[in-house]
């Protein structure tokens, strides 16, 4: 049966993720030895395995004590607390920073406003490494909200920023709450422009498609948000990590004429292409 397969615009690697992967490979070749990243460089198991094959290994911050002077540590695109960079440098480690420039921009805004006496509010997931890192630039004092519960005791003077992969509707909801409660507000919509474009693109795609596959790591925040957006418009939306998770029985439904494909910011082209090729084979 002939089907129309549509790939969403801007699917796959974003600028910050591609930059981090390229930097990791470059530094491994430059130093000619194992290098280490604080946490998985990106939230995609297939890419993490590829990096390990190239002597690039993820470690937790607690493991840094076991590293030797002169070992190379790469800060991933999510960024880290300001204190972490100093601690690693003080240990005699060679620290290379691949924090996404958009995240660095948030960190510096937060630091400046915190020093000016603003209470920082971060719209995002309190357990996400990007948010944990940003919070470290205001002495871990931020109020962090995912928009699912109303904020209480909002201070009169606040600075509001967002996790780069947050949904626009969540940002708007939280900001409306704050506007009603605070007298002095500095708000920076720090949702990455690529994230915004990607989310709008999949919203349109899922309206058009009968079935949607969202490709990306199950631990990827931005992929999960894309899946949530798709599911609202197209009930037959499925989050898969790679072609191995493609449920072929879903393609036996004769009512499915148009299949939409999108992918998170941590999903490389080769994984996307494998899924598309498999669908076209069936």
Swiss-Prot record:
Cofactor note: Binds 1 [4Fe-4S] cluster per subunit.
Catalytic activity, EC: 1.17.7.4
Binding site for [4Fe-4S] cluster: 14, 100, 192
Biological pathway: Isoprenoid biosynthesis; dimethylallyl diphosphate biosynthesis; dimethylallyl diphosphate from (2E)-4-hydroxy-3-methylbutenyl diphosphate: step 1/1; Isoprenoid biosynthesis; isopentenyl diphosphate biosynthesis via DXP pathway; isopentenyl diphosphate from 1-deoxy-D-xylulose 5-phosphate: step 6/6
Pfam families the UniProt entry points to: LYTB
Catalytic activity: isopentenyl diphosphate + 2 oxidized [2Fe-2S]-[ferredoxin] + H2O = (2E)-4-hydroxy-3-methylbut-2-enyl diphosphate + 2 reduced [2Fe-2S]-[ferredoxin] + 2 H(+); dimethylallyl diphosphate + 2 oxidized [2Fe-2S]-[ferredoxin] + H2O = (2E)-4-hydroxy-3-methylbut-2-enyl diphosphate + 2 reduced [2Fe-2S]-[ferredoxin] + 2 H(+)
Name the UniProt record assigns to this protein: 4-hydroxy-3-methylbut-2-enyl diphosphate reductase
The organism of origin for this protein: Clostridium perfringens (strain ATCC 13124 / DSM 756 / JCM 1290 / NCIMB 6125 / NCTC 8237 / Type A)
